[in-house]
């Protein structure tokens, strides 16, 4: 379905929220989708340039830091098979997080904040994930461990199975076509496989959220 990349994140967080004490912000549906798969006309893709995303995300992160949040996490599924190297959407949010954190530290602690004796434990804090640059962390919905065990695709078996498990009413297999090579494996999708994927994702989320 349209919006699958966001629905997958939203659906998994909805389940996780029932067992963890979380503040879940409204989902953000727009990203640097590109039109690499198909033209947008009569299809539905909306592309937002990564520079615009970065500016928006930076303002949002800056506001959350001022409110007092120090344990912020965002999850991205779109094009996240390249999350380590980065793709336009996740790079925009990662860069925004760094810029917002730097600006906040400079505003609240002043010049020389990193060289201050109070930061003498910076490298130890960084190793354990408690330094200021760990206040905002980005994650792929599926980490490398999941990618090794669950099919990652575009509207294929893996993604269709996730939707069958999380939002079954959004799946219309009668509209499946063999014309799209990337969606050919969707005929093998099942809610059972999707539930396996969801459980792996939830385990991943529990690990990174602590």
Please give the residue ranges for each predicted region.
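Extended, histidine- and acidic-residue-enriched regions that form the cofactor-binding/catalytic faces
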Residues: 1-210
